[in-house]
Swiss-Prot record:
Annotated InterPro entries: Class_I_gatase-like, CTP_synthase, CTP_synthase_N, GATASE, GATase1_CTP_Synthase, P-loop_NTPase
Annotated L-glutamine binding sites: Y57, G357, L385, G386, M387, Q388, E408, R465
Protein name as it appears in the record: CTP synthase
Keyword terms, alphabetized: ATP-binding, Glutamine amidotransferase, Ligase, Magnesium, Metal-binding, Nucleotide-binding, Pyrimidine biosynthesis
Positions of Mg(2+) binding: D74, E144
C-alpha cells in the first residue's frame, strides 16, 4: 500500500437507528473537504449474503453499485455525501464472510486445521477492511459496524477491529462510538447512564472509544460532556453532540462546528489543509431557502416505509434544489388506486412517479396512475417496474391489446409485452442473478432523454430480470410510443416516452442511484422542472 492509510471505525450503542451511517458519511465529507481521499464501507452482522433478497420492509431500499453489488441503503448515503462511486467491497455481511471461509475449508485451503471464529473469521473481516484501502489507495478508510454494541452477531467484527489497532499501530486507528443521550421530559433532564453502560460494554471487549458522538434532542451542557468523559475515560472535548437536524445535509456542518473532523485528524496525525466547506455551506443555504414548491405523487407498494424509496426521495430533492423548488411528496399506496378513485387521489399533484419494485401486488394501481398521468398530461417518470407498467398501460389502452401484461406478473397473459430476458430463462437462484450494475445506453435524437442528458451515450445502474419484449416493438412504435434509449446494440429497450405529452419518460434502469446533491441526476432535474411548469 503506497499510502499510510488510516482507519476510522464507527460503532453504535444503546439503540439502533442512531444515524451511524450519516455520521460516517458526514465525517467522510468533512475529511474530503480537507483535501483527503476517503472511502467508506459498512459491515452488516446478518447472515444473508447480501440484502438483495430481503423485503424492503425488513431492510429498506437495496442500493446497487456500479459493479453490480446489492448493498445496504447506507451506501447510498455514503455515495451522496462523499461523491464517490463505491464497490462491492464497501458492504460486507456476516453471511458473505462465513460463506467465503467455509468455501475455503471445503476446498482444503486450511490444510486440515480447525476452522474457528478467531482467527479465520476475524482474519477474513480484517482482509476486507484492508481491501478497501488498497482498492482506492486512500488516506482514510471509514468503516461502519452495523448493529448495536451488546449484540452477539457483531462480536466477530468488533474483535477484528480491535485487532486491527494493534496490527497497524494505534496511531493509525480511531474509534468513534455513536450513542444516545435521552431527554426525560417529566424530569427535564438528559440521562447519560445508557451511554456509560454502552461504553462499558465496548471497553469490556477491548475497545476504548476515542470520540463519543451523542445523539440528543437537547443540547449537551459542558457539565454533561464532562460527566460522560469522566465515566467513559475520554476528555470532555472528545464528546461530540449531534442534535436532530432539519435535513441530512446539515449534519456535516453541525459535526464540524463540534470539531469532529479536527479531532479525527489530530488523533490520526493527518497533515491536511484547512477545511473548505464553502460549496457545502452554499448548498445547505439553498436547501433552506427554496423559492418554489411542487407536489409529486409517489405511487408504490412499500410507501409505509419511506426508507424503501430513500434514493428516489433524495434524487427528487436534488432535482428540486436544481430548480429552486421544494418537492412535497404525496405518498400513494398503489393498492389503494382504482379507476374510480384515481382522479380524487391524484388531482392535486403536479407530477406522478412510479418507482421500482417486485411482485404483482399493487401493479394494477400503478397502471391506473400511469394512465391518469398520460391522459391528463401530467409529467410522469417511471423507474424499472414503473417503466414496465407504463409499457403495459400503453399496450392496453392505446394499442388495444386487452390483457397485455408482464409474463412475470401474469404468466398466462395473451400479450406479454414485458418478458424474461433470454439469458435469465435457465436461472433458478434468486440472489445476485439479475441484470445488475452499470450498463451503457444509447439515446435517440429528439427525445426528452437526449435533451436532459445532452449526450449520445450514458451509463446507468440496473436491477431487473424482465425487459421490454421486442416482439411488440414495431406495434408500440407505430401507435406512438417512442423508444428513446436502447443498449448500444439496439437489442434492449432502456427508455420509452410518449409523444404529444409535456413530459412522459420511463426508464428500465435506476437513475436515482447516481444522483448527488451537488450533481443532481438530469432526469430528476427535468422531471421536477416539468412538474413545476405544470402547476
Amino acid at each position: 500500500m503506497s499510502k499510510n492509510t488510516k482507519y476510522v471505525f464507527v460503532t453504535g450503542g444503546v439503540v439502533s437507528s442512531l444515524g451511524k451511517g450519516i455520521t460516517a458519511a458526514s465525517l467522510g465529507r468533512l475529511l474530503k473537504n480537507r483535501g483527503l481521499s476517503v472511502s467508506i464501507q459498512k459491515f452488516d452482522p446478518y447472515l444473508n449474503i447480501d440484502p438483495g433478497t430481503m423485503s424492503p420492509y425488513q431492510h429498506g431500499e437495496v442500493f446497487v453499485t456500479d459493479d453490480g453489488a446489492e448493498t445496504d441503503l447506507d451506501l447510498g448515503h455514503y455515495e451522496r455525501f462523499i461523491d464517490e462511486n463505491l464497490t462491492q467491497n464497501s458492504n460486507v455481511t456476516s453471511g458473505r464472510v462465513y460463506w467465503s471461509v467455509i468455501s475455503k475449508e471445503r476446498k482444503g485451503e486450511y490444510l486440515g486445521g480447525t476452522v474457528q471464529v478467531i482467527p479465520h473469521i476475524t482474519n477474513a473481516i480484517k482482509d476486507r477492511v484492508h481491501r478497501v484501502g488498497k482498492e482506492r489507495d486512500v488516506d482514510v478508510v471509514i468503516t461502519e459496524i452495523g448493529g448495536t454494541i451488546g449484540d452477539i452477531e457483531s462480536l466477530p467484527f468488533l474483535e477484528a477491529i480491535r485487532q486491527i489497532k494493534y496490527d497497524v499501530g494505534k496511531e493509525n486507528v480511531c474509534f468513534i462510538h455513536v450513542t444516545l443521550v435521552p431527554y426525560l421530559g417529566k424530569a427535564g433532564e438528559l440521562k447519560t447512564k445508557p451511554t456509560q453502560h454502552s461504553v462499558k460494554e465496548l471497553r469490556s471487549i477491548g475497545i476504548q472509544p476515542d470520540i463519543i458522538v451523542c445523539r440528543s434532542e437537547k443540547e449537551l451542557s459542558e457539565d454533561i460532556k464532562k460527566k460522560i468523559g469522566l465515566f467513559c475515560n475520554i476528555d470532555a472535548s472528545e464528546v461530540i453532540q449531534n442534535l436532530d437536524a432539519e435535513h441530512l445535509y446539515a449534519v456535516p456542518l453541525m459535526l464540524h462546528k463540534e470539531g469532529l473532523d479536527r479531532l479525527v485528524c489530530e488523533k490520526l496525525g493527518l497533515g491536511c489543509r484547512d477545511i473548505d466547506n464553502a460549496e457545502w455551506i452554499d448548498m445547505v443555504h439553498r436547501i433552506t431557502h427554496l423559492t418554489h414548491t411542487t407536489k409529486i405523487a409517489l405511487v408504490g407498494k412499500y410507501v409505509e416505509l419511506h426508507d424503501a424509496y430513500i434514493s428516489v426521495v433524495e434524487a427528487l430533492n436534488h432535482g428540486g434544489l436544481s430548480n429552486d423548488t421544494n418537492v412535497e411528496i404525496e405518498w400513494i399506496n398503489a393498492e389503494d388506486v382504482t379507476k374510480e378513485n384515481v382522479d380524487e387521489l391524484l388531482s392535486g399533484v403536479d407530477g406522478v412517479l412510479v418507482p421500482g419494485g417486485f411482485g404483482d401486488r399493487g401493479v394494477e394501481g400503478k397502471i391506473e396512475a400511469i394512465r391518469w398521468a398520460r391522459e391528463n398530461k401530467k409529467p410522469f417518470l417511471g423507474i424499472c417496474l414503473g417503466m414496465q407498467c407504463a409499457v403495459i398501460e400503453y399496450a392496453r389502452n392505446v394499442l388495444g391489446l386487452e390483457g397485455a401484461h408482464s409474463s412475470e406478473l401474469n404468466p398466462e397473459t395473451p400479450f406479454p409485452v414485458i418478458d424474461l430476458m433470454p439469458e435469465q430463462k435457465d436461472v433458478e437462484d434468486l440472489g445476485g442473478t439479475m441484470r445488475l450494475g452499470l450498463y451503457p445506453c444509447k439515446l435517440e435524437d429528439n427525445t426528452f432523454c437526449k435533451d436532459v442528458y445532452a449526450s449520445d451515450l450514458i451509463y446507468e445502474r440496473h436491477r431487473h430480470r424482465y425487459e421490454f419484449n421486442n416482439e411488440y416493438r414495431t406495434q408500440l412504435i407505430e401507435s406512438g410510443l417512442t423508444i428513446a434509449g436502447t443498449s448500444p446494440d439496439g437489442r434492449l429497450v432502456e427508455c420509452v416516452e410518449v409523444k404529444d405529452h409535456p413530459w412522459f419518460v420511463a426508464v428500465q434502469y435506476h437513475p436515482e442511484l447516481k444522483s448527488r446533491p451537488n450533481r443532481p441526476h438530469p432526469l430528476f432535474v427535468g422531471f421536477v422542472g416539468a412538474a413545476l411548469n405544470n402547476k
